[in-house]
Amino acid sequence: MKRLLFTLATCCVMCACEQKTEMNPFFTEFQTEYGAPDFTKIRLEHYEPAFLKGIEEQNAEIKAIVDNPEEPTFENTIVALDKSGGILARVSGVFFALTEADTNDSLTALNEKMAPVLSEHSDNIYLNQDLYKRVADVHQQEREGKITLTTEQHRLLDKYYKAFVRSGAGLDAGKQSRLREINKELSTLGIAFDNHILNENNAYQLVIENEADLAGLPEWVKAGAAEEAKAAGKEGKWLFTLQNSSRLPFLQYAENRELRKNIYEDYINRGNHDDANDNKEILGKIMALRLEQAKLLGFDCYSNFVLDENMAKNSQTVMDFLNNLWGYSLENAKKEAAELQKIMDKEGKGEKLAAWDWWYYAEKLRQEKYDLNEDEIKPYFSLEDVRSGLYTVANKLYGITLTELNDVPVYEPDVKVYEVKDADGSFLGLFYADYFPRAGKRGGAWMSNFREQAGEVRPLIYNVASFTKPAGNMPSLLTLDEVETMFHEFGHALHGMLTKCNYKGVSGTSVAQDFVELPSQIMEHWAVEPEVLKLYAKHYETREVIPDELITKIQNQGTFNQGFMTTELLAAALLDMELHNLTDTDNLNVVAFEKETMDKLGLIPEIAPRYRATYFSHIIGGYAAGYYSYLWAEVLDTDAFEAFKEHGVFDKNTADSFRKNILEKGGTEDPMTLYRGFRGADPSLEPLLKNRGLK
C-alpha cells in the first residue's frame, strides 16, 4: 500500500526543463483550501524538477540528522526521519495517482526514466551507514530500558529500524552494492510489466456489427457498448473491452459462445502473446532478482522475507491456511460445475462446460434456483443511490458526514470531491471518488492518498474504480458485485480518514499487509444487509424502494457460486505463494510453472486462477507473497461482523469500539492486539466458512 518516506511503486520523468522555484506548484505546500493538489496549475514539465528538488531537499534533511552533534534521540532521529521528504511526498502522491488512473505516453516515459533515480535515492537513505547507526542507537536505547516510549513511538522506531535492516544496512559493501543493482532493476521491470498489461487492455476491442450477436444481452449492456463504440468513432456498432464493467456482463449474458470464448481467452492470455507486451521473461527476471535479494538478506525464499513482517510470519503458516480452505472450495466448485453441465445438457447441443461458459450458465442457474437475475436487481443500484447509501452507513456507524465540493481542483472532470467531517464538525479529510473507466486507467479498484495523516495534518484520500458510465438517459447502474466493491474501497478510505496517529509512518493503512483488508472487507457486509438495502436501493426510474421479495432473493443467493469464486481466488493466492516459495529460479518458465502448480492442486479446467502469472499485477506491486491476505483478513472481517450482528448492525457501542480499536489506531499497535481489543478474543475460522457456504 505505502512505502516509508515516499512511494516507489512507479516512477518517472520527462526531459528536464528549466523552471523557476516559485512557479513549480510542488515546491511548496499547495496554495489551496485544505492543501489539496492544485490540478489547475500542475503541468507535465513540473514533475521532473519536483522529483529532483525533492531528492535534494531530503538529502539535506538526512544530512542534518546525521551531522547533528547531539546524541541520537527519538525526536532528533526517528521523528526527523519521519517528517523528511515533503516535496517528494507531494509530487509522488500526485504523479503515482495519475500513472495508475489517468496516464498517457508522456507520463509513462517519465515513470520509466525516474524509476532508477528514485530507487537509488531510497537506497541512499536506507543504506546510509551513519543514519543507520543513529537509528540503531535509539533502538538499542529502548531495548536496554534507557528510554521509555509510548506504544506508538515504539512501533515507529521498530518499523524504521527493521526497514534499514531489511534493506541491507547491516551487510558488507559488496552485498549492498548488489542490492542497489537489484532494486534498480526491479523498479524498471515492474513498470514494464504494468505497462504491458495496460497496453493489452487498451488494444483489445470486440466490435460487433450484427445485432444478432448481441442476443441475450440486457438493454443496459447494449447501451453501454453502443456508447463505447461511439466514443471510439464506431457509431452504430457495439464495442466491448477487457474492463470488468464491459467483459463480465458479456460473459454473463451473451448467447454467442464463440464471442464469449474470444473475450475470455484474450483476457486470460494478456502478457502471453510472445510480442512486445509479453511478460513471461520479465516475470522470470523479477522472481530471480527477488530470490537473490531474499538470500542476500538471510532468507531462504522471498515469501519468508515478506511474511516476516506480516501477521502470518512465515510461508508454512500461509500454505497451511490456504490448503485447508482449498479442500472445502474445490469440492464445492466441482459440485457447481456439475450443476452447470446439467443445464448445458438440457440444451441438447452435446457441449462440455468450458471456462468461458461459467458466468453464462451460472446466471441461468441463479435464475432457476433463486428466481433472480442481475438484470432484475441492477435498476435498484444506480451509482448515485449506492454512493448516498454508503455515506449514510458511514454516518450511522461513525457519525461522519460527506459534503460534495465543487471548487476543489481535480485531474478529470468526472472525479468528485467530498469534505469529510466528524460528528462534532471537525474536519477529517477530503475524499476523491474516481469511478469511471478511461484509456489511461489500469483495471481493478483501489484506495490511496495524496497526503497522509500525521498529528494535526488531515489526509486526502481517494478511491478509484471502473464502473459502467451513464449512457444517454440511463444512469450508471452497478452489479451487486460492484456495489460491494464500492463499499470495500470506501472501507479502506475510512481507515485512512479516521486514523488518529502522531506519525505518518504508522498512520492509516500503514499496517501489516494481511491486516489491511479488514476495514475494507468488513464494509462489504453492510452492502447487502436488508436494513441497509432499504436505505439506498431504489429503482432509478420509479424511485420504488427495493421490495422485500427481492431482498429475500438476494439474501438466499448469498453463497451462490462461492465454490467457483473461492477456488479462483485461492488458485491465484497459491500461485503467488508457490512462485515466491521457490529457492531456485534457474530455467523458470512462469507459464509452465503455473500449469504445473494448478495440476498439482487438481484445479478443474473450467476455472482459471483469478489472476494468471503474466498479468498478476498484485504480485508486482505491494502484494508479492501477499495475495493470501484477502482471505486471511476475511477470517477477521467475518468474525468481526458477528459482533455487529450480535448487537445490531448499527449498534453505537460496537461501531465506536471498531473505530477506536481498529480504524483510528493505524499501525500503532500489533494487529492481533488491536483485534482482540475490539473483539475480546482471537478470530474463528467458522464465520468465513459459513459466509462462503463452504461448510
Give the residues covered by each predicted segment.
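Positively charged n-region of N-terminal signal peptides that target proteins for export
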Residues: 1-4
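C-terminal motif of bacterial Sec signal peptides marking the signal peptidase cleavage site
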Residues: 14-16
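Short pre-active-site segment immediately N-terminal to the catalytic Zn-binding motif
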Residues: 468-487
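C-terminal, non-catalytic "cap/extension" segments appended to globular domains
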Residues: 20-42, 46, 53, 215, ...
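Sec-dependent N-terminal signal peptides
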Residues: 6-11
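N-terminal helix-rich structural modules
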Residues: 20-218, 239, 644
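Active-site-proximal, well-structured secondary-structure segments within enzyme catalytic domains
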Residues: 156, 188, 195, 199-241, ...
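Short His/Asp/Glu-rich catalytic/ion-coordination signatures at enzyme active sites or charged loops
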Residues: 31-46, 95-114, 138-181, 241-281, ...
